[in-house]
């Protein structure tokens, strides 16, 4: 909950799905957003990405021209896919700031005076499916050179939609994952407060991980994440369960015993049976505390850290 006019130092957008971006316009009216982190999409692919899904109607500029969408008042950082990150440092591509996947963004970098706090975003090739779509559309006889034309995409939307449905995989599989926390040389304690019904608990460890809608059941993604975080993962005490608790995106080894597992759902996800009962059982069996955050403001979980 933010006060009117309050500054948000850094905003992470895990991926461009309506249920993950619909609150941004309201947030922009209510707060001042200083910095936004998004997955990198090549410029030539952004129009096809934005206009090949009608669920993104009204959010096209957020994808095609993010700087302009935020009225050029926020710094935009694009996280490169893993494949392009190995030999890259922070760089500017056509006046756009990019950063390698797995690179630490320190609190000092964003102007927040918290010692040793950092954010580590991961991008496992978020835009890969757009490339697959381009190849498949060309095979279907569509003009590849016009796939960056809004009118051409709209005129051929039904054909594009059918091809898109037949592609393997899911764009959720590669949404951003973000670690937020402190390095190993700090041992803080944490206090949780919940209203109404109020429960309080004290724990050591402030560190969090946000999985967005990513598929943690994919071995390559999971193994790369664990290799990067190594011993840091054991310090994580707050875990956002991927894809609203879907059993297709979950593996029980992402849960640390004694942690808080947060499942974010709204009324739409009840139709999809999220969270899945098997996910709930796995969370409880690991000794984690399950908390469900919904579109009801009273479900808010606030984390207060002291160190």
Regions found by a protein language model. Give the residues of each.
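A cross-family glycoside hydrolase active-site/sugar-binding cleft signature
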Residues: 39, 211-212, 242, 264
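Active-site environment of divalent metal-dependent phosphoester hydrolases
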Residues: 16-21, 42-45, 215-219, 241-250, ...
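Binuclear metal-ion centers of metallo-dependent hydrolases, dominated by the metallo-beta-lactamase
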Residues: 35, 43-113, 222-226, 253-307
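Core dinuclear metal-dependent hydrolase active-site scaffold
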Residues: 1-7, 71-238, 246, 306-307
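Alpha-helix C-terminal capping segments
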Residues: 28, 202, 251-257
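Active-site metal-binding motif and surrounding structural segment of the metallo-beta-lactamase
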Residues: 2-38, 230-246, 259
């Amino acid at each position: 909950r933010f006060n009117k006019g309050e500054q948000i130092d850094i905003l992470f957008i895990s991926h461009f799905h309506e249920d993950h971006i619909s609150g941004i316009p309201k947030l922009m009216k209510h707060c001042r957003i200083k910095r936004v982190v998004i997955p990198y999409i090549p410029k030539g692919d952004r129009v096809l990405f934005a206009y090949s899904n009608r669920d993104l109607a009204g959010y096209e500029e957020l994808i095609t021209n993010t700087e302009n969408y935020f009225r050029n008042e926020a710094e935009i950082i694009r996280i490169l896919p893993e494949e392009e990150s190995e030999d890259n440092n922070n760089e500017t591509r056509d006046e756009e700031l990019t950063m390698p996947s797995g690179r630490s963004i320190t609190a000092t970098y964003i102007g927040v005076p918290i010692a040793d706090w950092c954010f580590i975003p991961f991008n496992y090739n978020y835009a890969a499916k757009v490339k697959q779509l381009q190849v498949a559309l060309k095979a279907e006889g569509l003009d590849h050179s016009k796939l960056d034309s809004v009118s051409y995409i709209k005129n051929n939307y039904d054909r594009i939609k059918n091809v898109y449905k037949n592609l393997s995989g899911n764009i959720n599989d590669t949404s951003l994952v973000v670690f937020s926390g402190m390095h190993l040389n700090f041992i803080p304690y944490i206090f949780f407060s919940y209203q109404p019904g109020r429960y309080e608990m004290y724990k050591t460890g402030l560190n969090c991980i946000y999985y967005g809608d990513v598929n943690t059941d994919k071995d390559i993604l999971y193994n790369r994440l664990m290799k990067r975080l190594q011993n840091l993962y054991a310090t994580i005490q707050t875990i956002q369960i991927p894809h609203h608790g879907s059993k297709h995106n979950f593996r029980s080894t992402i849960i640390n015993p004694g942690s808080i597992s947060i499942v974010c759902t709204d009324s739409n996800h009840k139709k999809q049976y999220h969270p899945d009962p098997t996910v709930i059982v796995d969370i409880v069996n690991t000794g984690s505390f399950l908390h469900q955050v919904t579109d009801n403001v009273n479900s808010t979980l606030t984390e207060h850290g002291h160190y």
